[in-house]
């Protein structure tokens, strides 16, 4: 769990997302409150519940991007799911408890990665011994082993091919399966391979032919897993899930829309299934029970057709912090193209550089691109910042196609170039509906 202050979190998000100050502040405070709660003792720590967030705003203004960047910042188990993927219990499809099972799997991966770092030095020594064994055999004399060890460390044997035994992480063509509509079965996903490997005593291994250099990553990973206490990995992962876990529920407005159609899986039913999860319940996973009382839920939706008040009143009450994200204006588009750390313009310049083409954009070209994107959003459909990708692709279509033949040249994109390639299309509403 990271210990950034709210100001530092907002500053980090500012590098990638333009505007939306209120939303950034809300998620920054929520993330910091996780850390504050960890500093409390006993009963008070149990009583402090996370303040779940509902982000409301049109498409393409940064809701999903905020969640994506927050995941990297948090250093905590984080899962992003679309609310529309789930069905009411009793219908074939994913039930909402799968969210928590996915969160536990992510936590297991995070904890294992962190614990691998602690045993990396020891794992590297063991990996070196296994490479030597593959090179000279088990019966080689100490002098031979030392001679090969020196060559190995000097990199003289990097390209030599060896055969090694590593753990078989695949499922061997035997798929796991879910039991539809049976969340009470308390097993989540049954994996036949897991059962067979336990019955036969230990993990399966497989032979792989690889070069000495490439074998190190495989063997260090394999040896690290052998040195890890798997029970401790699970214990830490369950603790991280319960106390630091964050669930981002996207497209929540799609299950809020009222429907008169009966007989099918109810959207209201999905909301009702979400209620205990958000309020606090115990979910059975294959690693053990997980309490959801202190998991932070961030829900988001455009609410074009429905409105937040269409959600079940009980669910509204579980999302006490409301944040509205505003629609983007022309100046925001200009800033998105120029100020963000990995802006579209920087991406295209870097991509063209790989072909030996030196691409530059003038200020009036950037202004023109932003203006066209805003006009199209107003006249066709408002898809927010995503419109910039469509416009940029159209403008650079010719250059991208001819780039291999332009090696060593410089290309300047100005307002006239932008106008020539998308100006007419953007003004023709009928055409732009299909092309832009």
Swiss-Prot record:
InterPro entries: AAA+_ATPase, ATP-dep_Clp_protease_ClpX, ATPase_AAA_core, Clp_ATPase_C, HslU, P-loop_NTPase
One of the GO biological process terms: proteolysis involved in protein catabolic process
Binding site residues for ATP: 18, 60-65, 250, 314, 386
A GO molecular-function descriptor: peptidase activity
Alphabetical UniProt keywords: ATP-binding, Chaperone, Cytoplasm, Nucleotide-binding
Pfam families (alphabetical): AAA (PF00004), AAA_2 (PF07724)
UniProt keyword ATP-binding present: yes
Subunit structure: A double ring-shaped homohexamer of HslV is capped on each side by a ring-shaped HslU homohexamer. The assembly of the HslU/HslV complex is dependent on binding of ATP.
Entry's family note: Belongs to the ClpX chaperone family. HslU subfamily.
Purpose of the protein: ATPase subunit of a proteasome-like degradation complex; this subunit has chaperone activity. The binding of ATP and its subsequent hydrolysis by HslU are essential for unfolding of protein substrates subsequently hydrolyzed by HslV. HslU recognizes the N-terminal part of its protein substrates and unfolds these before they are guided to HslV for hydrolysis.
Entry protein name: ATP-dependent protease ATPase subunit HslU
Gene source species: Mesorhizobium japonicum (strain LMG 29417 / CECT 9101 / MAFF 303099)
Native organism taxonomy: Bacteria, Pseudomonadati, Pseudomonadota, Alphaproteobacteria, Hyphomicrobiales
